Amino acid sequence: MFSRIALLPAFLPVALACLGYEGGVPTPTAHYSNSAVIEIAAGEVFDAGWAKYDRGSGACGGQTEGDWKDAVFYLHSGATLKNVIIGADQSEGVHCDGACTLEFVWFEDVCEDAISIKNDKEGEETWIIGGGAYHADDKVVQHNGCGTVNIINFYAEDYGKVYRSCGNCSSQCKRNVYVEGTTARDGGEVVGINQSFGDTATLVNVCTDADHPCVLYDGCEGDCEPSKVGYCSG
């Protein structure tokens, strides 16, 4: 059953609006395969003009975790990436070193993680606006920093988790996620957060068929495995 979730009962419009674009990945205007990651400097904006970028045939190694050098794009703090399609031939999609902004970034077939956010500080905000991701066996957004991730009008289909707060980073902290106007189909959890570290999740106008859109974990530090402990309420 497809449902609409609003975990904030106050200050909501009368009609729920799930605005994730459901028309599929946009048709690319060009296609570039690069042997190395593309870096976007702090504060700069990279507008791809709806071109598709990847790392070449055979780049995806399944769920083998890579680092920023394996990504298609590497954004330094405050950088913006917009109007781009990340092709299937990649190990890691987009890495952000600090808070970043992604506007209309599409992932046609996620390999390990689509978006990894690291080193953002408490009080800093990452914005993921529009765009979407298909076929993420595990996570679409992996959040290892300590700030807030805002996911607005996103679309996800065939996924494990749209957002996951790092369950076993070597140094843990409180993280926040805000999801609004997002559509998530044929997947697992919309968000997974660590109850043990005080994480917060707010879901507003989220359309999903997930049995439990927001899942709580007992996160841990280092060489350990976080355990699922319950579900969010609101």
From Swiss-Prot:
It catalyses: Eliminative cleavage of (1->4)-alpha-D-galacturonan to give oligosaccharides with 4-deoxy-alpha-D-galact-4-enuronosyl groups at their non-reducing ends. Binds 1 Ca(2+) ion per subunit. Pfam families: Pectate_lyase. GO terms for biological process: cell wall organization; pectin catabolic process. It comes from the Eukaryota. Its cofactor is Ca(2+). Its main location: secreted. One of its GO terms (molecular function) is pectate lyase activity. One of its GO terms (cellular component) is extracellular region. Residues 1-17 form the signal peptide. Glycans are attached at N168, N194. Keywords: Calcium, Carbohydrate metabolism, Cell wall biogenesis/degradation, Glycoprotein, Lyase, Polysaccharide degradation, Secreted, Signal. InterPro entries: Pectate_lyase_PlyH/PlyE-like, Pectin_lyas_fold, Pectin_lyase_fold/virulence. Its EC number is 4.2.2.2. It is an enzyme of class 4 (lyase). Pectinolytic enzyme consist of four classes of enzymes: pectin lyase, polygalacturonase, pectin methylesterase and rhamnogalacturonase. Among pectinolytic enzymes, pectin lyase is the most important in depolymerization of pectin, since it cleaves internal glycosidic bonds of highly methylated pectins. Favors pectate, the anion, over pectin, the methyl ester. Belongs to the polysaccharide lyase 3 family. This is Probable pectate lyase F. It comes from Aspergillus flavus (strain ATCC 200026 / FGSC A1120 / IAM 13836 / NRRL 3357 / JCM 12722 / SRRC 167). The lineage of its organism: Eukaryota, Fungi, Dikarya, Ascomycota, Pezizomycotina.
